[in-house]
Amino acid sequence: MAHLAAILSVPREKDYATIAAMPIYAYAILVAGWLLWLTPFFRARQSEKPAKQVDRRARWGILLVAIAYCLLWQGRFWERSPRPWQVALSIVFFALASVLSWTGARALGRQWRIDAGLSADHELITSGPYRFVRHPIYTSMLGVLLGTGTLITPWWLLLPSLLLFIIGTEIRVRIEDNLLASQFGDRFAEYQKRVPAYIPFPK
């Protein structure tokens, strides 16, 4: 009975103070960061080319990445008050993610798609951010994960989230690379040897 009464009781003033611990600017960073990152994908989706070949196994990677994102929000983030360095780092991650999503979607044009697939007149894109990484969209997704996690997620949730993201992204990268290799042969092999997948380390 005491437990039920505690659940039904009206929150006290200090409870509201706890709920409001996360400052409004942190919410603004989250909303702005996600919206700026997502907008080019919604626009690209409207002009997506039909695919002639799709490998649906990549959806397992999509599922793992989705779970990774969900983990970011499982902590009581509304009670967290991020430190200045966390706020600054989060803004940097979101900014980089947004730049990559806009430039990557623009370079892909109508070839952008969620599934791993090839269109009938598919082109090998090596311009824009594709000069530095073969999958800049995935780099931008990593930036959003780190931008969100730095701001609101405790480390014991951020680490498994990052691990799931890497596993899911590796699945997608390998499947997409195999599709591109089957289409472009030696030309893609040379590009793959020269340019890293989604983390811009020099090869």
Cite the ranges covered by each PLM segment.
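Membrane-anchoring alpha-helices and their flanking helix-loop junctions
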Residues: 7, 12-126, 144-203
